[in-house]
């Protein structure tokens, strides 16, 4: 405001001049000097963050023709700058005093205060959707913090008890299946853990797409499907498992059966549980007593498979003894939490001279042997100690430990020979000999050899067959990849020799046996023994197939389903059983110096394991007519639909590729209903013991019908929609199992080559929609043949097993 004060009337300059001329001596008052009287400042806003600005406005008051111009300055802890127009930009947090000083009168100024706070730290997470069965990369936008580093976490909705997937340290999210409608993905600041941001992420099912074409050729019958492929191990099995799953075989096997004493019903748990003797073999049908087991299994309509010792030791009569009592060996690494009397036979690091971080084994020896066991060596341990054919009499067999055991059953009217229907049908020649010096190190501290396993097995089998010619024998019951090709002695030799510290570095045992791989040597010697003794002594070549994939450094076998990455690894690794294109970093080629692809490099190439075709190839080459068995395996996830699909795939592969006997280790518990349903789809799909067919048919996914048999199934397509077909001899029905391994529905056409049936096919289905039952769905039409094949078009739900029963 400009204010001018006058003593008389106000007038313009011209008027005043006239007045002055006509008024004589009237007075004239001059204009006042410019004067600034005050400067005031306002700021908007008065509170800002370090990322904002505040506009300051100055109001200058005075009199006269003064200037309203000001200069701006800032002071205070917030620092910063003020532009010539009064725009304040802070430097840091605190308070800032914004001052405007008049240029007319620098003694006149005004101020206002601005409060500056830190930018509220925020984290924004994106995106807000993810597709089930895929990975989704999440990003975190961090504001208000100097560091962009975050940690990631994921949480499910309230009440959700299933998997929520997993998220990596970089924000890569692996979706779950089954999946909740949403999950919450959270990013938390590393520099300030009180700051986080979340996104509610909708999990969307993939759209229905077209799946690979499927073919089952009814004119191409491959082989009979042995029902014994649907077996289980007896440990933890329930009557419901056997009856509901219509399980045809139950095995008495595992570590705790190797040293079973049939005379006293005492066995030893070995390293599985503090090397303790105990009454019977716990967890088995028949209250742990072997004869009770045989009766119980027969009463359930299944065949019993027993285990006889070859390692040379059985438990003594002291049912409370243990090999490493705490009183004798105080300070052990671990002690039985129930009794407190027995240890695990390991001294911890730093005690008793142990300098190993994992602890040091207390050596097994005569004292440990005497505490729990008695020596019962097999009849022979080398070719030189095998009995002559003329000496292999009934009395000779009865004098052996195993022969005496078999004789006690054969001569008991309650059991009798295998052929009588109430005896023991099949005998395993011990269990996992490559682990004897670890699991049974208290009595068998040295690694097993070619001769010990082979001739101990042949002589034991000879005793069995001499007493009960109708019984069948299975061996060598060897587990894991390297043990198929080398003895345990070779493997441990290799561990101690460079340059690679692998079995091929010092395989002296294999070299002493003509360089022949362990199992092939075993078969060859049994074939020779048949010539010597005039009877087949080995009916099944038997391995354990723990060949599921590893995921994040751990085996998926025995594990719960996990996220979809783990699930895919699990179901993909069933290809180890058959696929010539599948390799696993844990399964390199055996690399013996006479192998065609032998390499001196330690980076040995991988080899497709093809476990079932490999077994059949060995048999064809070394002992034709021998059947094949995998009587322990476990792919895990049995509590989930993923485990059910994987188990169903395993059983389909067993039938399709001609395995003769299989037994799941770890029968499904009450919380693992899906695992049992995988057996039921083949053995009891209608609740009345209706079964999958008993003659395998050429079946292909993603392969043209005309080349299905010659080319085989396409591995990529089989990993989307697996197909297994068989004809059932009782009614000539065509049965087809289709497994949708993907997370979205797939629509495909199933061509039934050589099938002229029309009408409808019955449909039975198992999926996540109902994990407690196989559901009979509406029947589907079978389209009349066109070009030689009837067809069925069907949309297979995500993660499902579908069984078609086509009458012919």
What is the predicted role of each segment?
Residues 24-206:
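Extracytoplasmic soluble-region selector
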Residues 209-564:
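N-terminal catalytic cores of secreted or lumenal carbohydrate-active enzymes
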Residues 459-462, 466, 539, 548-634:
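Glycoside hydrolase catalytic-domain groove-lining segments
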Residues 640, 651-735, 760, 769-773:
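Glycan-recognition and catalytic regions of carbohydrate-active enzymes
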Residues 782-808:
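C-terminal beta-strand-rich structural cap/linker in extracellular carbohydrate-active enzymes
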């Amino acid at each position: 405001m400009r204010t001018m004060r006058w003593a008389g009337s106000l007038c313009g300059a011209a008027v005043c001049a006239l007045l002055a001329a006509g008024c004589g001596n009237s007075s004239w008052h001059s204009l006042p000097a410019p004067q600034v009287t005050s400067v005031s400042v306002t700021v908007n806003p008065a509170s800002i963050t370090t990322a904002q600005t505040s506009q300051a406005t100055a109001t200058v008051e005075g009199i006269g023709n003064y200037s309203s111009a000001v200069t701006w300055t800032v002071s205070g802890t917030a620092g910063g700058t003020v532009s010539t127009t009064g725009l304040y930009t802070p430097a840091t947090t605190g308070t800032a005093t914004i001052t405007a000083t008049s240029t007319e009168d620098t003694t006149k100024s005004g101020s206002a205060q601005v409060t500056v706070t830190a930018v509220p730290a925020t984290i924004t997470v994106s995106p807000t959707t993810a597709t089930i069965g895929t990975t989704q990369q999440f990003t975190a936008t961090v504001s208000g913090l100097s560091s962009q580093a975050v940690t990631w976490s994921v949480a499910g909705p309230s009440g959700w008890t299933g998997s929520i997937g997993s998220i990596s340290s970089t924000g890569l999210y692996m979706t779950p299946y089954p999946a909740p409608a949403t999950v919450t993905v959270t990013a938390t600041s590393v520099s300030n853990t009180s700051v986080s941001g979340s996104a509610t992420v909708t999990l969307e099912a993939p759209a229905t797409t077209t799946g690979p074409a499927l073919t089952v050729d009814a004119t191409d019958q491959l082989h009979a499907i042995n029902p014994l492929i649907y077996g289980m191990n007896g440990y933890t099995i329930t009557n419901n498992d056997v009856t509901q799953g219509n399980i045809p075989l139950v095995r008495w096997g595992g570590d705790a059966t190797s040293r079973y004493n049939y005379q006293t019903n005492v066995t030893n748990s070995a390293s599985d549980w503090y090397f303790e003797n105990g009454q019977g073999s716990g967890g088995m049908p028949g209250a742990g007593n072997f004869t009770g087991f045989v009766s119980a299994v027969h009463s359930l309509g299944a065949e019993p498979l027993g285990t006889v010792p070859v390692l040379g030791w059985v438990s003594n009569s002291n049912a409370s003894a243990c090999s490493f009592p705490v009183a004798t060996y105080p300070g052990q690494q671990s002690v039985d939490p129930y009794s407190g009397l027995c240890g695990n036979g390991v001294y911890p690091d730093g005690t008793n001279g142990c300098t190993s971080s994992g602890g040091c084994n207390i050596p097994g020896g005569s004292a440990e042997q005497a505490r729990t066991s008695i020596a019962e060596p097999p009849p022979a341990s080398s070719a030189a100690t095998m009995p002559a054919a003329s000496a292999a009499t009934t009395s000779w067999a009865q004098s052996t430990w195993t022969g005496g055991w078999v004789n006690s059953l054969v001569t008991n009217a309650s059991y009798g020979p295998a052929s009588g229907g109430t005896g023991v049908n099949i005998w395993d020649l011990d269990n996992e000999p490559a682990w004897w010096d670890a699991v049974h190190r208290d009595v068998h501290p040295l690694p097993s050899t070619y001769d010990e396993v082979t001739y101990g097995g042949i002589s034991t089998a000879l005793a069995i067959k001499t007493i009960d010619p109708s019984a069948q024998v299975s061996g060598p019951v060897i587990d894991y990849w390297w043990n198929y090709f080398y003895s345990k002695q070779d493997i441990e030799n290799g561990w101690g020799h460079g340059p690679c510290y692998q079995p091929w570095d010092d395989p002296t045992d294999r070299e002493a046996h003509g360089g022949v791989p362990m199992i092939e040597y075993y078969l060859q010697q049994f074939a020779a023994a048949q010539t010597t003794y005039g009877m087949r002594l080995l009916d099944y070549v038997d391995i354990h197939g723990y060949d599921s994939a590893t995921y994040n450094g751990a085996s998926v076998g025995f594990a719960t389903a996990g996220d979809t990455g783990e699930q895919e690894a699990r179901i993909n690794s069933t290809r180890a059983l058959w696929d010539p294109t599948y390799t696993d970093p844990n399964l390199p080629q055996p690399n013996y110096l006479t192998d065609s692809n032998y390499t001196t490099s330690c980076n040995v190439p991988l080899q497709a394991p093809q476990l079932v075709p490999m077994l059949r190839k060995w048999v064809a080459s070394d002992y034709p007519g021998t059947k094949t068995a995998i009587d322990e395996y476990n792919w895990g996830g049995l509590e989930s639909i993923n485990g059910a699909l994987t188990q169903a795939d395993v059983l389909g592969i067993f039938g399709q590729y001609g395995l003769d006997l299989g037994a799941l280790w770890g029968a499904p518990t009450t919380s693992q209903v899906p695992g049992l349903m995988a057996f039921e789809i083949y053995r009891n799909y209608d609740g009345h013991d209706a079964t999958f067919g008993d003659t395998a048919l050429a079946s292909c996914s993603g392969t043209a019908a005309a080349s299905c048999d010659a080319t085989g199934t396409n591995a990529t397509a089989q990993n989307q929609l697996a197909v297994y077909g068989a004809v059932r001899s009782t009614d000539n029905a065509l049965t087809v199992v289709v497994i949708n391994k993907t997370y979205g529905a797939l629509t495909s056409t199933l061509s039934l080559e050589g099938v002229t049936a029309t009408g409808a096919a019955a449909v039975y289905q198992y999926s996540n929609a109902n994990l407690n039952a196989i559901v009979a769905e509406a029947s589907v039409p079978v389209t009349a043949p066109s070009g030689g094949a009837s067809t069925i078009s069907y949309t297979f739900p995500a993660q499902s097993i579908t069984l078609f029963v086509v009458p012919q």
